[in-house]
């Protein structure tokens, strides 16, 4: 057979993102046939992915995608093995691709997601897309979780991908305002959206702590009750989203901000890398 040209190797790399040496070896094995070489690489990528599949994935990043025309969005947590890879361009793009896939194709489970035709290249599956990056970087990677929603959405992901938020409201919303609210949730990590959404056992625990602290002052019982009540009011203001002072303007609460914009909070999803065991 004729020698494999550098142009052919580059063309195969452009189509698969596989390392140059792997591309050359695949083209050699396929006698220069580009499509056969792609199949060879896909099989090799799957084999590499399987070998690395048992390695711990303690690092990763959060990615979000919103289609404002279709009023649909998703947030995902992608896992990998090391912090440098979590910040690498191929992994960042992969996480963004998976968020887009979830938003547009609505898979019910991670397994269904992996089996779907990849939205940007339907000839391959989502699992094939992940396997390409695994083969390129040589680390185990996986989709840890995702959440998809429809409606008026906003999102924000921290620059290092460690934390991200997807927020859903009712009403005509300014995208920048929803981004700001999402950023606030990322930074302040509220325990719930509203006071009535806080788990009762958590409220009971905080009340007990507040009363114990109040009793330690040695004040009369009626004063103790007022001190404990004040401590709980402070705790709710620090812990409940709509009662928290807005991070960019603490003269108003997040609830005031949304109400002033004619918006009603429906809910939010906040992901942090590593919250779930890998």
Positions of PLM-derived features:
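N-terminal assembly/interaction segments in proteins that build large macromolecular machines
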Residues: 2-278
């Amino acid at each position: 057979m004729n020698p494999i040209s550098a142009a052919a190797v580059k063309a195969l790399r452009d189509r698969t993102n596989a390392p140059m040496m792997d591309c050359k070896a695949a083209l050699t094995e396929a006698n220069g046939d580009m499509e056969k070489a792609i199949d060879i690489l896909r099989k090799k990528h799957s084999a590499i992915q399987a070998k690395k599949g048992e390695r711990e994935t303690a690092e990763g990043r959060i990615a979000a995608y919103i289609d404002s025309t279709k009023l649909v969005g998703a947030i995902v947590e992608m896992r990998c093995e090391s912090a440098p890879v979590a910040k690498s361009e191929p992994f960042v793009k992969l996480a963004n691709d998976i968020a887009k896939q979830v938003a547009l194709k609505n898979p019910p489970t991670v397994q269904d997601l992996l089996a779907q035709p990849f939205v940007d290249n339907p000839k391959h599956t989502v699992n094939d897309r992940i396997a390409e990056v695994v083969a390129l970087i040589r680390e185990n990677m996986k989709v840890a979780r995702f959440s998809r929603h429809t409606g008026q959405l906003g999102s924000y992901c921290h620059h290092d991908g460690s934390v991200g938020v997807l927020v859903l409201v009712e009403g005509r919303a300014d995208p920048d305002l929803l981004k700001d609210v999402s950023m606030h949730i990322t930074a302040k990590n509220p325990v719930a959206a509203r006071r009535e959404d806080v788990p009762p056992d958590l409220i009971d625990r905080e009340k007990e702590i507040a009363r114990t602290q109040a009793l330690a002052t040695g004040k009369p019982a009626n004063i103790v009750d007022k001190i404990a009540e004040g401590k709980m009011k402070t705790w709710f203001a620090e812990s409940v989203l709509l009662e928290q002072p807005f991070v960019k303007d603490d003269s108003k609460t997040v609830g005031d901000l949304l109400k002033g914009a004619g918006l009603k909070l429906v809910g939010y999803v906040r992901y942090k890398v590593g919250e779930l065991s890998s």
